Amino acid sequence: MAEKKGPEAKKQKKMKNKSKVEETDAGEEAGASEEQQQVTRLPPAFSLSEIKNKQRRQFMFIKLKQEKRKEKLILRKKRKKEREALGDKAPPKPVPKTIENQRVYDETTVDPADEEVALDEATDEFAPYFNKQTTPKILITTSDRPRGRSVRFTEQLSSIIPNSDVYYRRGLALKKIIPQCVSRDYTDLLVINEDRKVPNGLVLCHLPDGPTAHFKISNVRLRKEMKRKGKEPTEHKPEVILNNFTTRLGHSIGRMFASLYPHDPHFVGRQVATFHNQRDYIFFRYHRYLFKSEKKVGIQELGPRFTLKLRSLQKGTFDSKYGEYEWVHKRHEMDTSRRKFHL
């Protein structure tokens, strides 16, 4: 058949092109509306991982995040308006859930008013210290042939523990060191272990009858490595703060740390040593108070700082062969829940 020529053919061609454009626009609009429906109305069992196209999956993920953020913002504004409208009658703000306040209850949690606890404290190994019958005298030593950071860390520890002496081991076993410490009236033995010139362990032995605690040490920061540090610590006796040692085991560890420092701190020196237990990690900090006015006070860290994790608690003095252990950390058996702590 012969094709039509002239103005009628041109008219028909324009009409066809116009209809095609309208169809494509309608198709795009339909596709966009479908996309919005997919973003806003996903089936309940739908998972973004089911989308095979990576770009499409990322796009959908971003959209979902944005929508959730908008919903949270709207809900927050609504609650704020309700609280402002109620004024003093508004209910108290809900306490946010944390691992600490969701902690699994431990049966060995210590009650300070318990008579049995008071009797144990009056007869345990630390009773002479708390009854002021003995004065702390500490011997700080290291593993054989210490190097680098371990040496500097040991020296800085002696500067923040009053009445402490540093002696480097020369191949002498701990079993031989302990009787010598007892004969020279030392009340505690502190041993810094190292691996590849880095401190990685701490053994604390209370003398003469124990107990002995073994800690993993990490995150050691010496004074030189700290920012905005204060001047060198003075010889004043510091205050000691023990936080969150709530269980029977934690109570024993807290008393062990307290027995390192002498009684009657010198408040003139404004120095404080803090042992803060959080999720079975013991954070040590050494600060100085800065009194800005009669009502305002600040703190300035002096260093060093480090973190301890209890590995074992042994009855009596150090004995790796025949020692009786009160508590040993068994990771695969004990760390079954993130909300269960031992200290």
UniProtKB/Swiss-Prot annotation:
Disulphides: none
Pfam families: Brix (PF04427)
Ranges of residues in domain Brix: 136-319
Superkingdom field: Eukaryota
One annotated GO molecular function: RNA binding
Record bears the keyword Nucleus: yes
InterPro entries for the chain: Brix, IMP4/RPF1
SUPFAM superfamilies: Class II aaRS ABD-related
Coiled coil: none
Keyword Glycoprotein on entry: no
GO biological process, one term: maturation of 5.8S rRNA
Predominant localisation class: nucleus
Segments for region (Disordered): 1-51, 77-97
Composition bias, Basic and acidic residues: 1-10, 82-91
Free-text function comment from the UniProt entry: May be required for ribosome biogenesis.
Protein name listed in UniProt: Ribosome production factor 1
Gene that this sequence comes from: rpf1
